[in-house]
């Protein structure tokens, strides 16, 4: 479904997002978003001044906005994404324009039918959580959600196998102007000094290689991904006599997006946003089950 | 030589786990109900030691109750003794509620020297709760000013730290004015402020108090503790407090936790460890301070609290919600079993379901409620926590092994309590066993294995048996025995579960998990075959140690009785690799155990045969003739080995002892024909020697052939008297002794 308004999801682009998997939220309701914002902002204030009483609802240093993003989902079965934004009010002037966005977090589910079909009504299935901003805020917001909706968060690491899938999939995508190089970063961690190897390929070359590997357009198999990576490895070996297959793939960046094994993603093309999120949703669901 | 046989037969299937079953009275928190009881509840189970400790605490309390003025600590050995007793008990398991009145009374009355008072106050660590009355009476001591300033200060700090442990606070709230008057004391002022901060409710905020605080602030300057109290007053009554207070203050109160916090946590942990099921965590404040880690990976079981979200949606809604709040019973207030019974219809579940693991009262509730969302919430939480904290799957986790162990222990205890395994736990085991080293958290993991639910899940072989077998064969004898022990428990849990389902099936309940009886029988059979296989291999690898044989035979003690005791139409004989090592064991314990098992097999098979004949209809499950044949072969071998000395000739089992006479002659053993019967069997020969010594004290030639005829019967009686009960029931059931002259024959089950 590509008819989502790209303007409304543009905030996701060109930023680094940390990935988490979240178990289904219990008794979460889209009707109470404003109340959630108020409670969450009181919670943040309380966390910041350890153990002292805080009044709910008054103007606090940090403003919390919780909103629904109906544009960010795959199918009608998916829940609308939930965006949480924290802004800092400057203490000198109370004007609205002085607010500065310090942290955002986005719960979403793009084609997450695997999970959402199975769970009962009381639960809301938003298995993928992306955050941008200081981890201290992630911690506070996360704890509040954990306490309030009885869910658990886990950092969503991306395995080398999944990274190689991303490399293959994204290489094959059409982009108007191919300016960004396809880059793969490998890590050799067993050495006394850790060594990172960066392997950059011209995107057109990479695409040409992938096109020879892929048999049916629109369909990718594990075998094809393996062949693609093996070709890249043997090319590298021919030049540098290094077996990349013995190292660990830690990062993939292409014109579509870049992903790091620690669970960090950066979206670069709005037209492929849904596709990447769908893949990440799938990873998050397998993480939960 | 005394075996456990006696207690064996009448055992009911469901009593197996009574160790971890609950004693309802243990949930009462004491204090307000029955102080005596609560003292006992908080004792650790090693009773002997505790008995004496209990005594010394009682003595100490009665001493302090009667103590006269000014006893010198240095000169009076009784005071020394009792003081140390109080201190050591307090630090080890905390003090019972009734101790506080006595000890606070003596510490604040100024009867004894300050060093004694200080030590007493420092050891006032509660095991459960602190009675409000003891606190109120100590406040009155504070007012008469009998004790020194230092003791007063220490008392206030104690009160602040223990505030949440006081069982009621109504009377304490009534003393607000008294505490407020202490503000004028400059030294006490910071602590009094902190205490008032804890006590203040809206009705306490009065203009005269605000004025007094402002006066103090004018006198002493901007003090953070005064500001804290003022800001609280302002929060309650913004119209009365008009001054502006600085918005950001790092810390309002100095750390007044004093020497107690660590002790409280230690006592809490110890008491929790010692109780059969985790004690209720009655407070949210005293969570053990976990190490600094990433926010979402702390292994903390949440504390029960009601979900208060959606409370203030808008004004109108507010009223509705408040009304509803009156109706439901907040989970924080749930302290006793009787409260649970009274409010069970309006109890709200905690906002984080994981908290039920450490709240036995809620576990009772979980046990009787059928709500999918409860289990789903537990399932997700537990699954994530187990995976995230697993010390051998996640790098950098190994330093937290102790915490993970505790967690697994808690999960296991909960499973015992619910008599049911968690599916998240099962999945965790399947995922992580292939990566397990068999060492890390060993006993916890093996215990969790015992609660894998019974289902006709076909993957159990590749998920459980294969990884377990790999570890089994490559690990120590002790590990092998532990694995066998937990597989025995697993089998028993499955069988118990099956019995429960059978019982409830009359109430039209079908097997949950869609297990059919045949699927269930197959799963059980698969487990028994697996154990038979690993046992055979292990006996060879380890060279038949008695210790290992004991665990293997123990497993078969359950297997041989499945038909009669658990109503499962399945009997599986042990493989030859288990049977023959046991039969030829050098140890009478194993032989006796084997006899008992064969006797129970016989009883079960006979019962099955009779059932089959009497019902005259085709039963869904019939034991195969293979089982009967195998049983008969084993019995013939046993009778030949123990009775007729004919094992080498008569044994018909393909892997049995049948041997050619020519071959036997080559062994150069004289009288090989008689070398196996109850006299000559290596496991029995020791008895035969002792018997000969008693029967013919003068004969030193050890002429075993004397044991025959009437003497043979005496010898049998002698063996039975030595506690070989298994041998007795076997011989009495399986050997036909009517006509002794015509060769004794094996009793045949085949009808």
Predicted segments — roles?
Chain A
Residues 17-30, 126, 149-151, 213-216:
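Charged, low-complexity surface segments at secondary-structure and domain boundaries
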């Amino acid at each position: 479904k590509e008819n989502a308004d790209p303007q409304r999801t543009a905030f996701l682009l060109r930023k680094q997002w940390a990935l988490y998997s979240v178990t289904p939220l219990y008794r979460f309701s889209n009707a109470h978003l404003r109340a959630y914002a108020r409670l969450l902002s009181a919670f943040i204030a309380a966390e910041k001044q350890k153990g002292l009483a805080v009044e709910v609802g008054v103007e606090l240093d940090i403003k919390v906005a919780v909103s629904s993003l109906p544009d960010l989902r795959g199918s009608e079965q998916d829940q609308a994404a939930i965006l949480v934004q924290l802004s800092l009010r400057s203490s000198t002037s109370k004007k609205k324009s002085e607010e500065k966005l310090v942290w955002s977090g986005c719960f979403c589910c793009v084609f997450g039918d695997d999970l959402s079909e199975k769970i009962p009504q009381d639960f809301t299935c938003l298995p993928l959580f992306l955050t941008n901003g200081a981890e201290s805020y992630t911690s506070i917001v996360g704890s509040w959600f954990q306490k309030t909706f009885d869910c658990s968060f886990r950092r969503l690491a991306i395995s080398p196998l999944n990274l190689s899938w991303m490399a293959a999939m994204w290489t094959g995508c059409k982009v108007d102007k191919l300016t960004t190089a396809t880059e793969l970063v490998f890590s050799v961690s067993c050495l006394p000094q850790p060594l990172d190897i960066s392997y950059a390929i011209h995107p057109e070359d990479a695409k040409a290689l992938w096109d020879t590997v892929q048999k049916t357009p629109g369909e990718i198999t594990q075998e094809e991904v393996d062949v693609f990576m093996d070709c890249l490895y043997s090319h590298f070996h021919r030049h540098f006599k290094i077996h990349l297959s013995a190292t660990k793939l830690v990062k993939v960046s292409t014109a579509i997006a870049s992903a790091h094994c620690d669970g960090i993603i950066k979206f670069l093309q709005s037209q492929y946003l849904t596709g990447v999120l769908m893949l990440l949703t799938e990873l998050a669901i397998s993480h939960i089950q | 030589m005394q075996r456990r046989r006696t207690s064996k037969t009448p055992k009911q299937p469901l009593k197996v786990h009574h160790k971890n079953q609950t004693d309802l009275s243990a949930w009462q928190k004491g204090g307000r109900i029955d102080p005596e009881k609560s003292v006992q509840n908080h004792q650790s189970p090693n009773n002997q030691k505790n008995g004496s400790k209990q005594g010394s605490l009682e003595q100490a309390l009665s001493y302090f109750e009667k103590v006269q003025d000014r006893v010198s600590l240095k000169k009076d050995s009784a005071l020394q003794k009792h003081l140390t007793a109080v201190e050591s008990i307090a630090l080890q398991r905390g003090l019972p509620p009734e101790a506080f009145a006595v000890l606070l009374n003596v510490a604040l009355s100024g009867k004894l020297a300050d060093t004694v008072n200080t030590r007493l106050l420092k050891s006032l660590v509660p095991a459960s709760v602190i009675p409000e009355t003891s606190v109120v009476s100590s406040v009155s001591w504070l007012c008469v000013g009998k004790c020194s300033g230092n003791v007063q200060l220490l008392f206030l700090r104690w009160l602040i730290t223990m505030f949440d442990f006081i069982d009621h606070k109504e009377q304490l709230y009534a003393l607000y004015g008294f505490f407020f008057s202490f503000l004028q004391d400059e030294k006490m002022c910071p602590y009094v402020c902190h205490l008032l901060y804890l006590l203040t409710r809206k009705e306490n905020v009065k203009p005269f108090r605000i004025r007094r605080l402002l006066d103090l602030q004018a006198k002493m300057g901007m003090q953070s503790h005064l500001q804290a109290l003022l800001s609280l007053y302002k929060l309650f009554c913004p119209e009365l407090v008009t001054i502006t207070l600085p918005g950001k203050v790092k810390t309002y109160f100095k750390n007044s936790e004093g020497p107690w916090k660590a002790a409280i946590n230690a006592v809490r942990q110890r008491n929790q460890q010692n109780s059969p099921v985790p004690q209720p965590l009655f407070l949210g404040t005293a969570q053990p301070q976990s190490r600094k880690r990433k926010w979402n990976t702390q292994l903390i079981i949440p504390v029960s609290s009601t979900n208060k979200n959606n409370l203030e949606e808008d004004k109108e809604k507010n009223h509705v919600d408040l009304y509803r709040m009156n109706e439901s019973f907040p989970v924080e207030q749930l302290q006793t079993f009787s409260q649970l019974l009274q409010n069970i219809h309006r109890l709200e579940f905690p906002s984080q379901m994981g908290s039920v693991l450490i709240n036995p009262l809620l576990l009772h509730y979980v046990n009787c409620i059928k709500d999918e969302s409860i289990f789903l919430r537990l399932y997700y939480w537990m699954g994530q926590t187990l995976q995230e904290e697993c010390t051998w799957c996640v790098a950098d986790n190994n330093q937290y092994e102790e915490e993970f162990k505790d967690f697994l222990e808690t999960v296991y205890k909960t499973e015992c309590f619910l008599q049911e395994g968690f599916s998240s736990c099962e999945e965790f085991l399947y995922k992580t066993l292939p990566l397990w080293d068999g060492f890390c958290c060993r006993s916890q993991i093996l215990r969790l294995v015992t609660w894998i639910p019974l289902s006709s899940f076909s993957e159990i072989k590749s998920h459980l048996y294969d990884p377990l077998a790999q570890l089994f064969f490559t690990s120590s004898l002790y590990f092998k025995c532990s694995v066998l022990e937990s597989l025995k428990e697993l089998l028993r849990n499955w069988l118990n579960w099956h019995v429960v389902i059978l019982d409830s099936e009359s109430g039209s309940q079908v097997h949950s998990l869609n297990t059919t009886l045949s699927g269930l029988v197959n799963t059980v059979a698969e487990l028994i075959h697996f154990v038979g296989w690993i046992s055979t291999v292990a006996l060879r690898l380890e060279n038949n140690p008695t210790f290992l044989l004991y665990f293997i035979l123990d497993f078969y003690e359950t297997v041989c009785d499945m038909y009669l005791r658990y109503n499962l139409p399945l009997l599986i004989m042990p493989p030859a690799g288990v049977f023959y090592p046991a039969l030829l064991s050098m140890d009478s314990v194993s032989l006796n155990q084997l006899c008992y098992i064969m006797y129970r097999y016989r009883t079960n098979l006979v019962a099955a045969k009779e059932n089959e004949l009497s019902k005259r209809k085709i039963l869904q499950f019939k034991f195969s003739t293979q089982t009967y044949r195998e049983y008969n072969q084993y019995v013939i071998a046993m009778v030949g080995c123990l009775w007729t000395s004919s094992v080498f000739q008569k044994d018909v089992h393909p892997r049995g002892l049948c041997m050619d006479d020519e071959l036997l002659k080559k062994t150069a053993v004289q009288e090989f024909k008689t070398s196996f019967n109850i006299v000559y069997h290596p496991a029995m020969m020791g008895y035969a020697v002792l018997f000969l010594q008693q029967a013919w004290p003068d004969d030193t030639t050890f002429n075993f052939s004397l044991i025959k005829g009437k003497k043979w019967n005496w010898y049998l009686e002698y063996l039975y008297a030595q506690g070989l009960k298994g041998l007795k029931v076997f011989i009495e059931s399986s050997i036909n002794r009517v006509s002794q002259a015509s060769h004794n024959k094996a009793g045949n089950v085949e009808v």
